[in-house]
Amino acid sequence: MSEVSKISTLLAPEKFVKLSVSDKFKWKAPSRVCSIVQSDTISMTANGRSLFTFDVLKDVLKHAEEYTYVDVLGVVLSGQWLLPKGTPGSAEIILLDSRLKGKASVLAVFNCRAATQEFQFLISPGYSLTCADALKKPFEISCNVIDLPVKDGFTPLSVEIACLVQFSNCVITRSLTMKLKENPATRTFSAEEVDELLGSMTTLRSIEGLRKKKEPNDVVQGHLSAEYDVKRSVKRTKSENTPGKRRVNVDSVSLGLGKGKSVSAKNEDTESVFDDGILDSDS
């Protein structure tokens, strides 16, 4: 698979934001603001399935107060297996929008083999939500390990999430066709395959049970990595030109050692499963 790329490169706003003719004549105030938000590193341990909330607005609350809508332009999931190359087993990582019920809440399912050591995915959710809804922290990540020969108490995997969000006072029509130039071995699955990978509704019922038990500290914080104003062009704000070193907190996420057959044991080392009708993946 391809090497892991820089977040600032994958989520460069000019790849996602389409400027209108009226935008190019605006001089005084930006019509939109784009922010790259990166999570703390999540260290996975082997103690059963866990569910965490990803707070995308922690460092950009001022924009949530100034604007009406937040647009999720792109999401990058990066992972590093902390194991020898060739170790058997895999991880199932599910991204969810908890505002929705059942299968509709699944934005993407990633199955990543431990043998690959590192993985990275770029997806374009392609929809907006109100800032009021975003403040309720609807985005979640569920993790589970399958057939990994690791003892309890050790950390086999670290994961980081980053997203490009755009704030505006209107729902913007834009192009969301940008994909990774170096494709990290992805393919589109049929609805039947998605159902099989999710264990029909068993996995979703398990996640719903975790929501009821979730503690207030089960939140993966997002930190502002870069910010851009959309005027006549997409321009990085001066205050973010030379950002300081980002503080990284390590949150512990529990992962179970499942006994079921590894669903990623196919031809490709790393696979991306997209919910039918929600996301599209190009090879």
From Swiss-Prot:
Keywords: Host cell junction, Host cytoplasm, Host cytoskeleton, RNA-binding, Transport, Viral movement protein
Subcellular location: Host cytoplasm, Host cytoskeleton; Host cell junction, Host plasmodesma
A GO molecular function held by the record: RNA binding
Pfam family, one: MP
One biological process term in Gene Ontology: transport of virus in host, cell to cell
GO cellular component: host cell cytoplasm; host cell plasmodesma; host cytoskeleton
InterPro entries referenced in this protein's UniProt entry, alphabetically: TMV_movement (IPR001022), Viral_movement (IPR028919)
Keyword presence, Transport: yes
Biased composition (Acidic residues): 270-283
Region of interest called Disordered, as start-end residue ranges on this chain: 233-283
Superkingdom, natural source: Viruses
RNA-binding listed as a keyword: yes
Family indicated by similarity: Belongs to the tobamovirus movement protein family.
Role this protein plays: Transports viral genome to neighboring plant cells directly through plasmosdesmata, without any budding. The movement protein allows efficient cell to cell propagation, by bypassing the host cell wall barrier. Forms a ribonucleoprotein complex with viral RNA. Binds microtubules and modulates microtubule stability. Can bind double-stranded DNA.
Protein name: Movement protein
